[in-house]
Amino acid sequence: MKNLLWAAVALSLSALSFNVALAHGENKPKHGGVVSAASDLHFELVATSTGAALYIDDHGKPVALTGMTGKLTVLNGTEKSEAVLTVAGDKLEAKGLKLVKGTKVVAALTTPAKKAITVRFTVK
């Protein structure tokens, strides 16, 4: 009887964790980049010919970027570089960076409400 009770508890807990994972939706890239989630938002980092673009959405809807500030820190082996993120339409852009496979990127953002958000990526 005890084993049956423990099995029921384990099954219930696994079902709860599955629903929590589904609540945030899928992390599929919309712009061909690498996706990460933080602060209930989805972030997509995309390598561009001039640097990088960062798209932000909230459950599939683009986030208003007016007043958002931040920077990208790029770690490629022993090399470290940084660039300021600026609003460019529906995305934030950082120029002068080179993103290659295996590069680690940290986005440090500040929202208009002065909330700090840190997002980490590994370029694939």
Predicted features along the sequence, with ranges:
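Intrinsically disordered, low-complexity terminal tails/loops enriched in metal-binding residues
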Residues: 2-7, 14-124
